[in-house]
């Protein structure tokens, strides 16, 4: 009788006008109630009836009223809904279509759904993975939540789900772009390609690599210096900035690398065949020649030019590494000509590595973790591949080539696509100086650390320390690497300028730099110049690709390690993050990340302290763990729904002996000096 009473509505409005309002974010619990988080220190209880009008993550305005002598929040206005486009799983209730969001805090929701026009509801089964859109929300005046399914990703039990679901979640493609029937060479009429087909270039790649985009040649000169030539595949010979394929490449940004598979940026017929620097096949290439002094210094005779080249040998990392490290390889016996090229490339790479160790920054060796999959997409094994001699040889060649490109673009145009890093965050510099002063770092004043040379010197000093604790500590004070169109320094590498051009099959920014380098060769205005937005676009692509790579890996780790808690398998793990709730570690055997809550280290809040600022964990005020430490752990939980691992140390910390106990009990003979173990 009161439902449509205008007087009652008017009274309710007057009451609400007198109530205070707060803006905040909804945090749901798994028990029906929630909280309105206004800031880090202020939150209000949201009773279950009010939670039915909102969901976890919604930004809302709420009335703050008193009920049962307690302040509670009643959401009244939606500022921003947490769900718009999302990934979910089909739930069928009495034959009716519902969707449960694939989100740890929202999985228990079951939202009524319908399919968009053109999709058949009969094609959807329990547990199927879908892309859905929240189209109705109670705080928008709707009766309830309602979603529309726009796309079916895959069936409930399809083992390809980790890849397809993750790609859909990040709105990324799951296949390469379509090729065209007849690729045509579109060189500028004035571009002359030198004939280098007789020069014995070699490619060094993984055994299964098809998109071979770099070929190398080096010759050690009588005075000990090295004549180096780097040849790079040339997709911009076939794709102009006006072509539709260029727009596709820009929209993708990079080839997407996921565990066990990749999604190429360019069509495979171009990347794996026409542009790939295959053995004994003539290919157009963009080349750089330069002299590297025997002390590793890059000479001033940098020359970029276009050429037709031919790879004389398709080599494999492990075979070359075996041959260089042991003198022979069971799988590969080079001709004397190729052997000499490889020896000279190796000697060049050692000269450059030695220079970097004293003038720039050398990154510590860490394994690349590689998932081996069966034909059915099951994980067969997880390999920890260390960077070997041949990998370093190619890496030094590519870094040298990119330094040469950076210098050339800076001098010729003053712009390009540059990888940059600004060193320490300005607002954190005082913290860095204080931390380094306490630990005896030389020349670690703010003025010095604000230079590339000073930053690099500090990184080299940190690399000489017995542990990686300090190195881990200062990482959070560092800026993020960026991509931009200005020639700024790359502090993290210890370089004044750095512009990549060595992977144009896989990186759109490298395609832009190819066009700029061709303009430099021709002495003409560039056919494409990088605008202000290109760097932001590429950085955003890279961010989404890394998230996708990590999410697929987390899913596969959870699937692969599901039985390990029951087996109580022991793992060596390295601490890479410490915060108030506990610490995060990486399993050295396979690269999986696990969380170790403080309560599983020692279930006594009075005795344990997890200090995120110092990167330490203390028990009874004594440091027991710190960043960079390696410890033995077991997994206690593998949550396949959330794709997360929880573990605990195998080390057990004893209970404190009470004063009463120690005063009434006599110590055993000869044990007077023994103290309880922390």
From Swiss-Prot:
Subcellular location: Cytoplasm
Annotated stretches, region: Disordered: 658-678
Pfam families registered for this protein in UniProt: OB_RNB, RNB, S1
Primary site of residence: cytoplasm
Family: Belongs to the RNR ribonuclease family. RNase II subfamily.
UniProt-listed Enzyme Commission number(s): 3.1.13.1
Keyword NADP carried by entry: no
Catalyzed reactions per annotation: Exonucleolytic cleavage in the 3'- to 5'-direction to yield nucleoside 5'-phosphates
Annotated GO biological process: mRNA catabolic process
InterPro entries on file: CSD, NA-bd_OB-fold, RNase_B_OB_dom, RNase_II, RNase_II/R, RNase_II/R_CS, RNase_II/RNase_R, RNR_Ribonuclease
Record's protein name: Exoribonuclease 2
Domain RNB positions: 193-521
PROSITE patterns named in the record: RIBONUCLEASE_II
